[in-house]
Amino acid sequence: MKNKKVLIVSARYYEELSNSLELYATSSLSKIKYKIIKVPGVFEIPVVISKNIKKYDGFIALGVVIKGETPHFDFISSASTQAIMSLSVDSKKPIGNGIITCLNMKQAKARGKKGKEAAKAVISVLSQ
């Protein structure tokens, strides 16, 4: 695991929540080299992973999508999840999905530890 490199791509749209996701994700990566790239929103995460797919052994996608009054929530969460899954399967590299989708801010704040779960998933696959 020493020589493995992981890229964390973190959406800044809800910055306070993203910071929490990052903190929990990085707390699990003490034995792995990692870099964090910050992007404006969840929709930009897949393209940044795609651009870096050959440089890293694994990836962690972090961000928050909160349901509003329009169907935008459904489009963004579905499209980003689909793109991340396709990238992972096509590249045969693990991508921990730490993008949380919530109905309100209270739910989002309660799920800040999901970054750690995404990191642990990547570590688990990399160690196989």
Regions picked out by a protein language model, each given a short descriptive name:
Residues N3-I36:
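Glycine-rich phosphate/diphosphate-binding loop of Rossmann-like nucleotide-binding domains
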Residues L23, F43-S50, K113-K116, K120-I123:
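Amphipathic, non-transmembrane alpha-helical secondary structure
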Residues T26-K54:
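Active-site rim loops that border cofactor/substrate pockets in soluble metabolic enzymes
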Residues I37-G41, F75-S77, K113:
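Active-site nucleophile and cofactor-binding loops and adjacent substrate-binding regions
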Residues V47-A83:
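Glycine-rich phosphate-binding loop
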Residues S80-Q128:
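C-terminal binding/interaction regions
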